[in-house]
Regions:
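Internal, conserved structured core segments that host functional sites
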Residues: 90, 95-168
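Glycine/small-residue-rich interface belts in oligomeric ring/scaffold proteins
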Residues: 19, 26-102
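Arginine residue identity/basic-tract feature
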Residues: 7, 18, 42, 55-57, ...
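Generic structural signal for well-ordered, non-membrane alpha-helical segments
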Residues: 47, 82, 86, 116-127, ...
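C-terminal auxiliary extensions adjacent to catalytic cores
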Residues: 2-41, 161-224
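Amphipathic alpha-helical hairpins
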Residues: 67-71, 110, 130, 224
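Short linear loop/turn motifs
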Residues: 72-76, 148-149, 181-184
Length: 224
């Protein structure tokens, strides 16, 4: 993360003692492990704080399992995620990188047509949480312009669209933006399960991330 960037909105100080939070760090082929871990550690507290706000306020995001979790997750991952949620996140991230607000708004409206009414409502609610919790940060670029458009009713404010902007603001790689989204979906669905049944392996997240990124010419390694 760029140390010169001035961000006035700071996450609450973490408690002295807390449970360890699992994360998945994916390294691009031309990136060193040390650099990847350093970049990720700088954004880790923000990601944990922002996503904890979503988890605290909502029961589910897009994934609301109708039955046993493992088969429901497999169907969701290979269906909804690979068919439209993952591609949307990639396209939104590309629009953010190019500073193309009109493209970002168009993608946001397109996603509305791919979600059922309940998913769309939860997606907008979660997107609103991210937008509110990053409002005070300075030098937001396209994230700030997108927020203004959403507040003016020009775009729905879906979670994945907002997350693409937030991830870029904190200089997260596309691979880690995708991986942390997947972890959030799983954690929200599995939070009431016994600990031994609620864990999703790093390799599982990395494998699905690779599938989503297929064709993006990225080689990924799990390092933490």
């Amino acid at each position: 993360m760029d140390d010169t960037a001035d961000r006035s909105a700071e996450p609450p100080a973490p408690p002295a003692l807390r449970l360890l939070t699992p994360v998945t760090v994916l390294v691009d082929a031309d990136e060193t492990v040390a650099d990847a871990l350093d970049d990720w550690s700088r954004g880790l507290e923000w990601v944990c704080w922002l996503f904890s706000s979503v988890r605290q306020r909502m029961e589910h995001l897009h994934f609301a399992p109708p039955g046993p979790l493992p088969p429901a997750w497999a169907a969701f991952a290979q269906g909804h995620v690979r068919s439209h949620l993952g591609p949307h996140l990639i396209a939104a991230a590309q629009a953010v990188l190019s500073g193309d607000l009109e493209r970002l708004k168009a993608l946001d409206h397109q996603l509305s047509g791919r979600l059922d009414p309940a998913q769309a409502a939860r997606s907008r609610e979660a997107g609103g949480i991210l937008l509110r919790n990053t409002r005070g940060a300075r030098y937001q670029g396209i994230l700030g312009r997108y927020r203004s458009a959403q507040e003016a009713g020009q775009t729905p404010g879906h979670f994945l669209t907002v997350w693409a902007g937030v991830g870029n603001f904190f200089q997260l790689s596309l691979a880690n933006v995708i991986a942390e989204y997947l972890r959030l979906e799983w954690d929200m669905a599995a939070r009431h399960l016994p600990e031994k049944d609620a864990a999703l392996s790093h390799d599982s997240i990395a494998s699905l991330t690779r599938q989503i990124l297929h064709g993006q010419k990225l080689a990924l390694r799990v390092v933490a």
